[in-house]
């Protein structure tokens, strides 16, 4: 664990601070992705300069994976001699933001992507 922990933290830091394709953590803790003609989710159709399925913003599945990754980091941290509490705290905030942003009570389902 001590060998892979630095790599896991670098990945976390890049997502939090921002990386290519507009991927970054927003103020609410959710991940934003996509810019211009970049398609960064599994719905990556592009026909020339036209995006039939644009999903720029906060895609639901990316943020579900983000939440899960934070919980995993919290559990792995002690095995690497690190404190997992900050990851749990961020995951709590992400979970609350996820429910606010994605849950559609009137339809009883989740939104696909939010701005």
What are these regions (language model features)?
Residues 1, 58-60, 111:
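Substrate-binding groove/exosite segments of carbohydrate-active enzymes
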Residues 13-32, 54-56, 65-115:
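Catalytic cores of carbohydrate-active enzymes
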Residues 34-58, 115:
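Acidic/His metal-coordination segments adjacent to aromatic residues that form catalytic metal sites
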């Amino acid at each position: 664990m001590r060998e892979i922990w630095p790599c896991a933290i670098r990945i976390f830091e890049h997502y939090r601070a921002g990386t290519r394709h507009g991927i970054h953590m927003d103020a609410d803790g959710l991940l934003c992705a996509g810019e211009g003609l970049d398609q960064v989710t599994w719905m990556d159709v592009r026909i020339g300069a036209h995006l039939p399925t644009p999903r720029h913003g906060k895609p639901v599945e990316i943020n579900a994976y983000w939440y899960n990754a934070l919980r995993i980091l919290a559990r792995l941290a002690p095995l690497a001699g690190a404190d997992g509490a900050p990851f749990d705290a961020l995951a709590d905030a992400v979970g609350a933001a996820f429910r606010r942003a994605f849950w559609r009570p009137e339809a009883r389902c989740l939104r696909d992507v939010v701005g």
